[in-house]
Structure formats: structure tokens, C-alpha cells
Amino acid sequence: MARVCQVTGKKPMVGNNVSHANNKTKRRFLPNLQNRKFWVESENRWVSLRITNAALRTIDKNGIDAVLADLRASGEKI
């Protein structure tokens, strides 16, 4: 399973570990992904999403129905 947020599309990014001696080695910054189930009143069912905490805040702000409508408009199968 890819480490990609279903709502925001955030993916792992690449950067450097930097030691005290300023040696640099490659590392990955992973998104803070959470598996969450949401009750969708309009569909009378639970919907499972793999989302970041930033997406969770977006759902709190806009509502799950609006977020699901955007996902379906972009072609995501929910």
C-alpha cells in the first residue's frame, strides 16, 4: 500500500539527515498517515480512508460529504 493521503495527495519526500559534523545522508520524510472510518449520514454507511492529520482537519472544517464529493469528482473510488 502506497504511503499517500487519499484526500490531500501528500507523499513521502526526500531530504537529508545532517549530523553535528555536517555529514549528510539521504532520508525520507513520511506523511503522518492514519486509517480512519467516517460515518456518512447521507449514504448510511461507514467509509474508510487513509488520510494525513492535515486532511483530518480539512474534513473537520468542510465536512465529510464535501470531501467525498471532491474525491469522487477527481476519479477516486470510495
From Swiss-Prot:
Biological processes annotated in GO: translation
Keyword line: Ribonucleoprotein, Ribosomal protein
Source organism, top-level taxon: Bacteria
InterPro entries assigned to the protein according to its UniProt record, in alphabetical order: Ribosomal_bL28, Ribosomal_bL28/bL31-like_sf, Ribosomal_bL28_bact-type, Ribosomal_bL28_sf
Molecular function terms from GO: structural constituent of ribosome
A GO cellular-component term linked to this record: cytosolic large ribosomal subunit
UniProt keyword Cell wall biogenesis/degradation, yes or no: no
Coiled coil: none
A matching Pfam family: Ribosomal_L28
Keyword Ion transport: no
Protein family (similarity comment): Belongs to the bacterial ribosomal protein bL28 family.
Name the record gives this protein: Large ribosomal subunit protein bL28
